[in-house]
């Protein structure tokens, strides 16, 4: 199966809501049978964790979440021997120290955790050092607040302290120290269907 079919099978919104499979199939296809390390930030019910297991036959999947909404014991994919999970706040300074002790470098890091500018910036700053020089870091569901009248969207207005131009600019400033590529999958219905890909 291709990645879109795998996402759909596992009821993962990277296919059903967003079209992220278009980018990931392109970037990941050459690594399907390689022994690589993937870090996923934001586990939730494990739909994407299971999808990575199904797609990558040899990859080790590391996944991090606060697990405040779903107990890890209730996520079947976390029981796989190729998965290692962490109960952690990806924005905390302690998180970086804990991962430093693991002495692991990742081929791909996918941030599907907090979908706020500050949360994405802090997570990025915590984990970018653990990306291999040839690796790629993906920030999903980015609200591009400087365009498409996104500041007036009801969700943004409902959370005024989380979505500010200042915090958005801080995110952009932080990632712009590296090579950044934008992938716009957004629509009027789903304005945050946007990925920022970062390479060293």
Name every feature range the model reports, one short phrase each:
Residues 1-110, 114-139, 143-200:
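A short alpha-helical cap/connector motif
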């Amino acid at each position: 199966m291709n990645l879109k079919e795998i996402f759909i099978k596992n009821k993962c919104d990277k296919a059903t809501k967003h079209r992220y499979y278009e980018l990931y199939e392109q970037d990941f296809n050459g690594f399907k049978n390689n022994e690589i390390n993937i870090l996923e930030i934001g586990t939730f019910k494990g739909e994407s964790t299971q999808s990575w297991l199904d797609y990558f036959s040899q990859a080790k999947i590391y996944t991090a979440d606060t697990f405040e909404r779903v107990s890890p014991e209730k996520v079947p994919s976390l029981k796989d021997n190729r998965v290692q999970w962490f109960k952690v706040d990806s924005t905390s300074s302690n998180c970086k120290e804990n991962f430093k002790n693991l002495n692991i470098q990742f081929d791909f890091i996918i941030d599907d955790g907090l979908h706020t500018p500050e949360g994405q910036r802090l997570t990025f700053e915590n984990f970018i050092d653990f990306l291999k020089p040839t690796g790629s870091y993906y920030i999903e569901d980015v609200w591009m607040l400087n365009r498409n009248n996104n500041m007036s969207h009801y969700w943004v207005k409902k959370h005024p302290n989380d979505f500010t131009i200042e915090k958005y600019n801080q995110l952009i400033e932080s990632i712009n120290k590296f090579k950044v590529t934008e992938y716009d999958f957004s629509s009027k219905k789903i304005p945050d269907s946007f990925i920022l890909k970062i390479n060293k």
